[in-house]
Amino acid sequence: MAKIKTRFAPSPTGYLHIGGARTALYSWLYARRHGGHFVLRIEDTDRERSTQESVNVILEGMSWLGLDYDEGPFYQTERFDRYRELTQRLLDEGLAYRCYCSKERLDALRQEQMANKQKPRYDGRCRDLTEPPEGAGEPVIRFRNPLDGEVVVEDRVRGRVVFRNSELDDLIIARADGTPTYNFTVVVDDMDMGITHVVRGDDHLNNTPRQVNLYRALGVEPPVFAHVPMILGEDGKRLSKRHGAVSVLQYRDQGYLPEAVLNYLVRLGWSHGDQEVFTLDEMVSLFDLEDINHSASTFNPQKLLWLNQQHIMRAEPAHVARYLAHHLGERDIDPADGPPLEAVVAAQQERAKTLVEMAENSLFFYRDPADYEPKAARKNLKPETEAALVRVRDLLSELEDWRPEAIHECVLKAAEVLELKLGKVAQPVRVAVSGGPVSPPIDQTLALLGKEATLRRIQAAIDWIDRQAAG
């Protein structure tokens, strides 16, 4: 049995979007599950819309997701000689022909067919020409599609789909300027690269019978096809920019872990029992094309956010720290200027929904608060709480065993002496050291900050209260 080989073949006309990333993931998983190869091909024949910037964004998105490829990236613009060679071969064998019909004639034909409630299709006028009409311009090249019979596609997702050749027209495989068309290049590339399984959106299904006929005209069996349903927004319409972030790298910038995005993408059309959270290894071992749903999936941002929280919570702190460092760097924070990043992660894993949230809540570990959150300050930094801050400062200044347990005892002792509930002491301390009302448990927070920074910040808060009171 031939080694399984799948491919992802984006057009570099924009970013790596959610739908494309899901297609790449499904192709990658199937190859990895079966010990095969995954190929990356850049379909850049549309020279007007293709940009190097888009190529870079696609490659960056693939890298961030961890979807490594065994071959490529291949570029179609580097293969024009091969397309010309096979176009000529089809012409020589009578399997393609030159079409001289003008745009005006084709437009009129289309209008007439639509007026007669017929399916618009080329009528084959040039099919049997032996020489160019007088005054004709440069021709396009059309594939001579069979006129009768059927094309049967055994689709791994949709099952058997049957197309009648009589309903297919003679598609253009090369434009008048000689550039090849999508339907031709994709067949040639998949043939030359030995692609065995093609996973793609079901909007390509109508191209499939034409491509199958092209494969056979070129003397090869077509690959196995798996057409996956589209992704819808919550309003039931096809997912687009109006539904929010659709670029993979936007989710990176918003603080999502790549494995959380992959987990969400795999669940957009595939399931395994009632399991929701999957590691990448689990996805590889469980995924199969036959298990993909037949109906469209709805993109739910809240579900993605929940999965991100689950992955942050379950990951090793060192793994999360790698990605958190990027977000801290974006905020001009050097993690070397504070407590170990892994410890900062471990203290916040249970609560953080995104790495952006974790980064924002981690800033005070690396630099003194520039000011206090107004509402938290009004409630917790006032003359009535100054005694608690002074007591905690004095107890902590004498503490040599700077561990969470010992710190907790100091805060507890201050509360007992002042006959206050623990929160009435801990919260002013929290606002004093962090600048806001939210942090990990106060003993963990102070342990991570260290003795010097803790005492300095508590004293700064005491001084701030005195200045406010003095007017």
From Swiss-Prot:
ATP binds at K241. GO terms for biological process: glutamyl-tRNA aminoacylation. It is an enzyme of class 6 (ligase). The keyword Transcription regulation does not apply. Its EC number is 6.1.1.17. Belongs to the class-I aminoacyl-tRNA synthetase family. Glutamate--tRNA ligase type 1 subfamily. This is Glutamate--tRNA ligase 1.
